Design a protein with these regions (language model features):
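Residues that scaffold the ATP/ADP-binding catalytic core of kinase and kinase-like folds
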Residues: 13-14, 64, 138
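Acidic, PIN/NYN-like endoribonuclease modules and their adjacent C-terminal/linker elements
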Residues: 1-5, 19, 97-106, 114, ...
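Short, well-structured N-terminal submotif of metal-dependent ribonuclease cores
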Residues: 1-53, 68-72, 150-153
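PIN-domain endoribonuclease scaffold, especially VapC-family toxins
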Residues: 4, 36-107, 115, 119-122
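Alpha-helix capping/helix-boundary segments
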Residues: 10-11, 57, 112-113, 134-135
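Generic detector of short, locally flexible boundary/turn motifs and exposed helical patches
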Residues: 16-20, 27, 89-95, 112-113
Length: 153
């Protein structure tokens, strides 16, 4: 399959779990997830050719990933840095999200995710991987490729 866009909470799970699976249960923002969820997430992502991110998601993950004490924080930040270096960034102007009709309901970042889903790069469409049920439904209604992570749990 083509590239996948991973939403904030799942990207946080991916980064924290990649640093150490034991950090998942230590991180307050990941209380609804466990190591099995991390394994499922890795399996789903492996089906795609690349992970694509937007700066807005990375800023959110950066702030959330730091909400744990050292030495875990340091290890997570190093893993996050490595991820940033390896993944593909697609810069989208905030105005693209603000101009979408979904902006008022979903906010800037999710509106930008939908905007990215609407793009077609050299015949390759982006798919969205999310744990946000409302966002998944909206993406599906718009005809975008979407995987609702909660359906895999």
């Amino acid at each position: 399959m083509g590239p996948v866009i991973v939403d904030t909470n799942l990207l946080l799970l991916l980064i924290v779990g990649a640093a150490s699976r034991k950090f998942i249960r230590m991180h307050d923002r990941l209380s609804r997830y466990d190591e099995a969820d991390f394994n499922t997430l890795e399996m789903i992502i492996s089906l795609y050719s690349d992970i694509v991110y937007i700066p807005h998601i990375m800023a959110e993950v950066s702030g959330l990933s730091r909400q744990i004490k050292n030495p875990a924080r340091r290890k997570i930040q190093e893993t996050f840095r490595e991820f940033i270096e390896a993944a593909t960034e697609v810069p989208l102007p905030s105005r693209d999200g603000a101009r979408r009709s979904e902006f008022h309901r979903f906010g800037l970042t999710d509106a930008l995710l939908l905007s990215l889903c609407s793009m077609n790069e050299n015949g390759v469409e982006f798919s969205l991987l999310t744990a946000d049920g409302d966002l998944a439904v909206q993406a599906e209604m718009l005809g975008y490729g979407v995987v609702n992570f909660d359906h895999w749990r």
